[in-house]
């Protein structure tokens, strides 16, 4: 919608800051560890295939990818990580899903609850907002580098569900099972991806005003700064004036 930016575009802008914080490698490695608990062969483990594809998108070195797989399968120590999701609400009644990877469930739930409360949000019961989201692969590319025909041809032929123009950014949605194949096809076509990850896509979004948007971004930043938090998903559209402040 004109004047507002979707969550994936917000995440893309924030990703430039996240990269500076050096947390992307840790997130990618933890996701591989968790995924590899379901089996160390990506050919028969769709989640591991997707995790490896996302790790490659942030340039995680191959040796770190291999070590993370071995930690997940138990071949190396360090795989004692639990995957937990929390659901709740932020300012303006915005729905939030917080995905964490932790070795201490009690510590993490206490910290997430404290952050939500401090920033005008609240923890909800399991399932309170999860039904509002669908897990998808999301790949973004710079809209100025590639034409619609180039992106559509490479992505849709590889099995992507949808290609969208989100204000100067091409946003590609895939089923989880097709995510790795689409990422590989774009790479083979010589396309440079700004981001490639599994995300929770809201079925509907809520527009917020600038003041609420800033409060929400402070909440999201605080959650993402927590070492145990992997991802934060939300269903709000951010006014462009607030999005510009993320640059």
Curated annotation (Swiss-Prot):
GO terms for biological process, alphabetical: regulation of DNA-templated transcription
Keyword RNA-binding tagged: no
UniProt keyword annotations, A-Z: Cytoplasm, DNA-binding, Transcription, Transcription regulation
Cell compartment(s), UniProt: Cytoplasm
Gene Ontology CC annotations of this record: cytosol
Record's keyword annotation contains Transcription: yes
SUPFAM superfamilies in UniProt: YebC-like
Entries under InterPro entries matching the protein: Integrase-like_N, TACO1_YebC-like_2nd/3rd_dom, TACO1_YebC_N, Transcrip_reg_TACO1-like, Transcrip_reg_TACO1-like_dom3, YebC-like
GO function terms (MF aspect): DNA binding
Family to which this protein belongs: Belongs to the TACO1 family.
NCBIfam families: PRK00110.1, PRK12378.1, YebC/PmpR family DNA-binding transcriptional regulator
Protein name: Probable transcriptional regulatory protein DvMF_3201
Organism, as annotated: Nitratidesulfovibrio vulgaris (strain DSM 19637 / Miyazaki F) (Desulfovibrio vulgaris)
